[in-house]
Amino acid sequence: EMQRSLVGSEMCIRDRYRSGDGRNHSQSGYEYLKNEAHISDDEILNCVRYHHGMYLKNASLAEDDKAYVVYYADNVAAFSDRREAEAGEGGFDKAMPLESVFNILNGNHGQSHYAMQVLNPKNEINYPTEDEISMDEHFYQSVIQNITDNLKGITLDEEYINSLLAVLEANLTYIPSSTSKKELADISLYDHMKMTAAVASCVMQFLTAKGEKNYKQSLFINAEKSYDEEMFLLYSMDISGIQSFIYTIGEKGALKGLRARSFYLEIMMEHIVDELLEKLSLSRANLIYTGGGHCYLLLANTDDTRDILAVSYTHLRAHETTLHL
């Protein structure tokens, strides 16, 4: 339920603002979801309208409104992806493209950025370039239209959360989460939204386990104290025995065999992750990374989570072959 509210709440609110709508993105996003996406769920609408403190403090909301959870999660996600640039200046630039994360890696000072695109398997890989690029309102408007069209076939419930995530990934991967001139713009809007959803779902599970129902008190009034609480677990899995599994094949049809076994490993890890997330009542928003026989998940630091992880691990170990988890 939390992820349904959160993913729906963050939906393209910044795109709406950057497409030429001059209002603040909280109000703009609220009206978009209500009037154009025809979302009538007050829980989702409140999460959009009041996800910034300046609006939340004057809102007449119940103490257990999930807008407080979204506000808190948005701040936590922003702490990790909003970093000031060395020569940053004030103001915002709505035409700012997404920068490459490799610009500052290992002490680099690159100027590469990505072309404005949506994900499309027919397109060539969108490699970063130093050619002059700027986002335009037409692109943002087309992204909003894409998302609006896709929403018509999606029900905002737990069965469609992963589908909604896929829609957002396709449209928001090359859009920066922040266009502040004083900050680095190398985190996509999709990644910020996804991380906000992951954090929010963990916070909800953590507070529920504690029996805490006054979200206003714990996450808004006493937010600074809550930031020090150990609410999260970073959980990783690794498949060992990959090399011997992949390369113990005969010469005949070797290339096809390598591809088949590599694909098998990828699908196996994806299946394990999906099964685990379902048991934990989470979505793929909580999957930080998967690939090469590894994965990382953001989970709630609760006894229930630890118990589920222990049981799942025991079951998986009981069915091991030459591959070990």
Give the label of every model feature segment.
Residues 1, 28-39, 190-219:
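Alpha-helical phosphate/pyrophosphate-handling elements in metalloenzyme active cores
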Residues 1, 5-125, 175-179, 227, ...:
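Divalent metal-dependent catalytic cores for phosphoryl transfer on phosphate-bearing substrates
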Residues 2, 6-7, 13-15, 311, ...:
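Residue-level detector of conserved catalytic or cofactor/ligand-binding positions
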Residues 22-25, 188-196, 258-269, 309:
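Phosphate/oxyanion-binding active-site loops and adjacent basic polyanion-contact surfaces
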Residues 34, 38, 42-61, 67, ...:
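Extended charged low-complexity segments that act as oligomerization/scaffolding linkers
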Residues 123-177:
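Extended, charge-enriched "interface" segments that sit outside catalytic cores
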Residues 235-244:
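Catalytic-site or vestigial catalytic-site microsegments of nucleotide-handling domains
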Residues 252-280:
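Surface-exposed, low-hydrophobicity interaction/linker segments
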